[in-house]
Amino acid sequence: MKRTAWNIVFHSLIGLRARVLATSDPGLRGLEGVVVEETRHSLVVETRDGRRVRVLKANSIFLFQLPGGSWVVVRGEEIAGSLAERVKRLGRLKGVGWLVRAGEKRRYTRG
């Protein structure tokens, strides 16, 4: 399945370009690079100069560039936990709901 703004939290983030928009550590704000590692609680971002920096997911807001070139804002709480845990959360969604991202609304159903 293709990574989109609507399902990005249920995919691996490794390989995506990322920018830290907000975080509890002021020294990491504005950090930009490629996600090279993902754990339950953090992302490791490799910058252009080759530095690898660990950023905690909690209390952070990220901007990810999708493979098609568009950018999506994701709160750290949405990507908290391992990929398997995030997919389990998807399985617990019931019925019809709304996903809201970047000022748009899209209806989803669990089928």
Curated annotation (Swiss-Prot):
HAMAP family: RNase_P_1. SMART domains: POP4 (SM00538). This is Ribonuclease P protein component 1. Signal peptide: none annotated. It catalyses: Endonucleolytic cleavage of RNA, removing 5'-extranucleotides from tRNA precursor. Gene3D superfamilies: Ribonuclease P/MRP, subunit p29. Keywords: Cytoplasm, Endonuclease, Hydrolase, Nuclease, tRNA processing. One of its GO terms (biological process) is tRNA 5'-leader removal. Its EC number is 3.1.26.5. Consists of a catalytic RNA component and at least 4-5 protein subunits. Part of ribonuclease P, a protein complex that generates mature tRNA molecules by cleaving their 5'-ends. It is an enzyme of class 3 (hydrolase). Its main location: cytoplasm. Belongs to the eukaryotic/archaeal RNase P protein component 1 family. GO terms for molecular function: ribonuclease P activity; RNA binding. The lineage of its organism: Archaea, Thermoproteota, Thermoprotei, Desulfurococcales, Pyrodictiaceae. Pfam families: RNase_P-MRP_p29. It is found in: Cytoplasm. GO terms for cellular component: cytoplasm; ribonuclease P complex. It comes from Hyperthermus butylicus (strain DSM 5456 / JCM 9403 / PLM1-5).
